[in-house]
Amino acid sequence: MVMDDEEMLRSLTSSQLIMLGHEPILVADGEQAINRYQELQDRGMPVDLVIMDLTIPGGMGGEEAAGTLLQLDAGARIIVASGYSNDPVIANYREHGFCAAITKPFDLAELSRAIESALR
């Protein structure tokens, strides 16, 4: 699952994930991510990995959404993504419940490494 408020970034990340052999689900904010994650989980189709934008102007961002997802599923694997490399959440991502962090913009190799790290 990819959560980002910018449609262009969702689309780009989706294309990268497809190249890496994944089937992405796209959502625009934390509320959509939580609802879709729960819906899929209830249908027996668990989400393997979520990539969450840290900051969603006017909506629920990655930190809050990750906390809720981890309450629903303690085994959720979540990567935090941000354009702000000096953000304390990026620097200390594990303390905030994330499995990996990636700074935007990222290329295919960086995304692949973050996914490998998160799924370990």
Residues of each region from the PLM?
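Conserved sequence signature across two-component system core domains
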Residues: 3-5, 27, 50
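Charged docking surfaces used in two-component/phosphorelay signaling
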Residues: 11-19
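C-terminal output helix
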Residues: 14, 88, 106-117
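Short hydrophobic/Thr-rich beta-strand motif most characteristic of the beta2 strand and flanking loop
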Residues: 21-36, 102, 114
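Short amphipathic alpha-helix used as the core "switch/output" element in two-component signaling
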Residues: 31, 35-38, 63-76
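Active-site residues of response regulator receiver
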Residues: 53-54
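As written
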Residues: 68, 93-101
